[in-house]
Amino acid sequence: MEKRLIIAVLLSIGVLYAYSFIFPTPKPLTAPGAKQAAMSSASAPALPAAVAPTAGTAPLAAPAPQAGQAPAVAKDVTVDTDLYTAVFSTQGGGLKKFVLKKYKETVGPQGKDIVLVNETAANRYALLSDSREFGLSPDALYSASTGEVKVTNGGKGSLEFTTTTSQGITFRKVYTFSGDAYRIGLTEEVQNAGNVALTGAVHLLQTSRVVEAKKEGRYEVHAPSTLSEGKVKVDKLDNLLKNPVQYGKDIAWSAFADKYFMDGIIADKGSISQVRITRPANDAIQRDIVSPTVTVAPGQRSAVNYAVYYGPKDLDILKLQGNRLDEVIDYGWFGPIAKPLVHSLKFLYKYTGNYGIAIIIITFILKLVFFPLTHKSYKSMKDMQKLQPKMTELKEKFKNDRDAMNRAVMELYKTHKVNPLGGCLPMVVQIPVFFGLYRALMYSIELRHAPFYLWITDLSAKDPYYVTPIIMGVTMFIQQKMTPTNMDPVQAKMMLMLPIVFTFMFLNFPSGLVIYWLVNNVLTIAQQMYINKAVAD
């Protein structure tokens, strides 16, 4: 097979792969895997000073007459930090609303804050607790330790909800907050003030909102995932309409994420035994996070810890949460390439203050790294081009004997020390880097609403006037015209269609990715001019 045909095939495959990566089939939305709360009959974990328990195995003092007695009407409790505002309810001790302060829905001063939780999803709050064995209802009314929590400048705060069940169980939910972190601590504690030992598990019901998938914006990717048995498993929303999903081994976390934001429940020391995912309504999914079964003797207590995360899918922030939560960002097969590129972008941004400039610098660096391979590729193409007249003679001479022609061609390559794949293989090596950079740019929250210059105000969105993709197509055409070729006329025409195909594909690409491809083309043209001159000399 001629070298040019191989290149044509590889480029065609590359186009198909690029198209599938750029326009993936929208993933059905599903609820993040529910996390199980591990109930240990050992000592209760440390709680804020205002609610610190006695030793885990010590008998509990009988509660005061009003202890755990909840008000008849549900009330809201607002938690305000530097990063978010959360509204909890004494109904279920659940999360009613969660608003991010640092991120907006749209570009510009009129953009509203991102809302990750609202009360409309299946008419259920998030982070509700349920246990039939302990007589606890998810809609139970709790008493709150305070009516408002305000945490700033890296300070700490806490909120405690308490209720008493008909079985004589006092149930406490304690949230702990940091002014400078999205991570929220959650402790659920069962205290048995009755006369009979009770056995059961506590369920943490996490409801997440489902939004119709869209081609552009944060809901382009919208799905739940669970890290179970060492693997990240993503569930499809359509399947959940008929069949709930359950995980029951080595659960580290469960999350529900769109393209840029997520909510997640992170296990603490095996605190999750099962995760059950259902779709109770079209606009919601629910994760039932089940704790291991535990027996609580009279006068004893048992507690379980989680970390709750509501916030951006920032690679560095998620890495700090532990339990491999950063793997909620799906870079696919190209993760080992994409992650270093993301870190490189963030590093360069510290010095440039502009992610567009950072992309250009990375493009230039990659071009330098691959220059030896590219030089070798173009030199091989030039050598093949010089042999084209002799190749034509051999084809004419052995037109009726294909085997003889192939032997003669191989002998020609050997005589002139030409590798027919020499111009192709160096380019193939660069393909994983391109897709790795594509994934890095496509799913980096850092590029969301990040401006470049002039009319490009959001590097994660398409060019509103299509200027950069059109220029990119022109540079790709120029690049192809400068590239040595020994194709027949039909193949040459097919290759000239690629700039047109790529231009239409890139019309809806994030402008950050278009800038990369455009700058790469310009550098390739300059490189080709240099190589052509060097070869001629």
UniProtKB/Swiss-Prot annotation:
Molecular function in Gene Ontology: membrane insertase activity
Protein name: Membrane protein insertase YidC
Keyword Cell inner membrane among record annotations: yes
Organism of origin: Citrifermentans bemidjiense (strain ATCC BAA-1014 / DSM 16622 / JCM 12645 / Bem) (Geobacter bemidjiensis)
Cellular component terms (Gene Ontology): plasma membrane
Family classification: Belongs to the OXA1/ALB3/YidC family. Type 1 subfamily.
Keywords associated with the record: Cell inner membrane, Cell membrane, Chaperone, Membrane, Protein transport, Transmembrane, Transmembrane helix, Transport
Subunit structure, as described in the record: Interacts with the Sec translocase complex via SecD. Specifically interacts with transmembrane segments of nascent integral membrane proteins during membrane integration.
Regions crossing the membrane: 5-25, 353-373, 418-438, 495-515
A Gene Ontology biological process term: protein transport
Subcellular location: Cell inner membrane
PANTHER family per record: CYTOCHROME C OXIDASE ASSEMBLY PROTEIN COX18, MITOCHONDRIAL (PTHR12428:SF65), OXA1 (PTHR12428)
Domain of life per record: Bacteria
Function (record text): Required for the insertion and/or proper folding and/or complex formation of integral membrane proteins into the membrane. Involved in integration of membrane proteins that insert both dependently and independently of the Sec translocase complex, as well as at least some lipoproteins. Aids folding of multispanning membrane proteins.
Topology within the bilayer: Multi-pass membrane protein
NCBIfam families linked: PRK01318.1-3 (NF002352), PRK01318.1-4 (NF002353), yidC_nterm (TIGR03593), yidC_oxa1_cterm (TIGR03592)
Listed Pfam families: 60KD_IMP, YidC_periplas
HAMAP family: YidC_type1
